[in-house]
Amino acid sequence: MKVPVLPLRNLTTSPAFYMFVAFAAGVLLGDSFYGQLKSYVDWAVVLVGLLVVLAVAVLYFYDRRSSLPLVSFAGVACFVLGTVVLVDDRKGQEVIWAEGIKTYRVMVEDAPVEKENVWQFTGRVLPTEDISDGSVRNDIGKLVRCSVAKKNAGGAKRALVNDEGDGQVGKELLLRPGDELLMRCRITELHNTGNPGEFDYAKWLRRQGVSGMAFCYAGYWMNTGESDDMPLTVKALRARSYMVERSAKYLSDDDLAVFSAITLGDKTKVDKEIRNVYSSSGVSHVLALSGLHLGILFGLWQIVLKHLDHRRRRFFLFMRLLGLLGLLAFAYLAGFPKSLVRAALMLAFCQMQHHFQGEPFSVNNLFSAGLVILLFSPQALFDVGFQLSFASVLGILLYMGLLITPKTLMKRPVLRWVVSLALVSVVAQLATFPLVAYYFHTVPLYGVVSNFVAVPVAYLLLMLGLVFYVVPFLQPLMAPVLHFLLSLMNTFLGWMAEVPGGVLHFRPSLVAVLLIYVVLAMSFRALRRGVKYVDWRFVRCAVFAFTLCVGVELYAVWRSNLNPQIIFYGSYGGVPVHFIQSSSSSYLWMPSGVGAMGAEKQVEHLKDGFWADHHVAPPVVVADTLRRDDCLVRGNVAWFGGKTVARVNARLRSGEGRMPLAVDYLLIERGSKSPLSVLLEYYSPRQVVLSASLSDYYRRRYAEESRRQHLQVYDMQAEGALRVEL
């Protein structure tokens, strides 16, 4: 019996697009309503199976001249499947962590990042019996975001101990992927500080597959060496770390940071200054392994294939597959980042199409690669790199066909390469600037110029990097050449980042981003047949969407003005208290002993978030005393907008308080160890605010004592920042 062929006559040339959109819509639904849907996963699986059976039945028994029933069943099946895969992935991350401090055996899963006082990494919990009570954990295999202190504040070592008091001093060694750590700490659920407008770090970690977070003090963790349970991906990252360490003998810190990022995808040594330079100059994609890097490597392999005998199809196919295996090995060594996986899959689809006389570079291949990625990692849909990678490639595939290259350039390879690079840069920047503005709030305007230097230099660095890593005895000879190229690129990009007007600061809302993409889509439809045959219907739609976008942004600016209010910002150190009169006039009250520099460090994350969204001018930083018409601060008490706030961050003695001062809010911070009854000898509050800097013991104790005194309690650890409208 002849197997029926999938009827695609009435579909567009990209059937994978519809499947991808349906699957992505299901992923969005599953993420938005996870709590309500997680109990119905089994029924959803049955529904997917039923839809597949119906689709197969349509292929055999329905009129094959009509594709609507098949497309409908396939679309609904992909939609439900996307929901099922996302919900199942989220359920696999759920865990109830043990209460209190326990001993964990953790394997370093990714490349650790060394900060000034801590190591930060993602670790996987390994099977172990608790040293204290012999209980077996049920959280085996879960990922935890760990921060381990390198030393105590006073520089003294403390012992990794169990309940019997035995222990060993923790070793501060260079951490690598695959190292096994014994940690005595408490693992908590993912949470944020709860400040308004802050980056949702907990959600970002969850979408990376992380289930908990932990902080381990110095001396309470110990590096026991290489783990015996390393998977292949961790072994690859460990090998990469050794390669980077060997390169450090011949390259400076800045050169090593950029070189290892471009060639191996190791960005752990790239500091904030380098990131800002590359971002402001519009070439941050050079530091992130993506289709650019795989395209360079595969282009080199294509040069080799051109000299082979194409008539020997089997041998030629074998060489193509060998090249693809090389790309997969490169992606494996880099840790399989989403952008690199997308590029590798797309190149694989392209080579298959090309071998069978199909169109190699098509939108269908792009969405086929995306569908495969989401099928195995549904939360990759929310990854910024994944979105930017797809947007840039989709823009290039769609818009490059509209740009006609003059025939005179076809005879001049160098000039043709320059024009092609400029066009690709313009199209990629046009396709990604809404997402870049939404996530990073900046749009580099001179990215096209920067790419003329960054892309060729990255090409040379990647080629030389292959020789540098494969032939170690040439490293001393190649180091000066690499230093020259890296210095050339870094100097030029640093100059481009400082050019006046080179960066546009733009903070669009999600609605505005969607409308901008509507404008781009309508423009593409209008110019689809060329400049001479403009479809003015779509031009009018684009103008309407652009006008609506401007209106949405103007309304957002009008809504951003702040009314008088007091905000207690969440912080694990001293709590910054923000007295806001208006967006242009405010005061930031810091705890005693923390001056302007300390305030700058603690509230740095607020500048690019809540303050920028509401156009808040730099506040007046208050440490001890302030006397203004609208604000008065004296010691540990402040008056603003008819409200009185007192803060306690030191031990108070009983019997020394006179008449209690009536206050609206009593802020209790780390350092306060006196019972609440003693604090009430000094202050008579309407509400007690507990800082997140308090330990669990003191937070529970103060909360219980406040309830016994019939006082309102606000726990910043559980509820985040406290915002009081005046």
Region locations from a protein language model:
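Membrane-interface helix/helix-cap signal primarily in integral membrane proteins
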Residues: K2-R9, R65-P69, A77-H285, H614-V633, ...
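Hydrophobic alpha-helical transmembrane segments in multi-pass membrane proteins
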Residues: V3, Y18, G26, R65, ...
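Membrane-embedded alpha-helical segments of integral membrane proteins
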Residues: N10-F61, D383, F390, P476-R528
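Functional transmembrane helices that form membrane-embedded active or gating regions
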Residues: K2-F17, G100, M410-L430, V449-F452, ...
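N-terminal leader/targeting segments
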Residues: M1-I101, R342, V534, V688
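Non-globular, low-confidence helical/coil segments that flank catalytic cores
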Residues: E172-L173, M183-R186, W204, P413, ...
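Divalent metal-coordination and catalytic microenvironments
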Residues: G26, V106, C185, I262, ...
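Membrane-interface amphipathic/re-entrant loop segments adjacent to transmembrane helices
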Residues: W221-V234, S280, A437-V453, L461-Y517
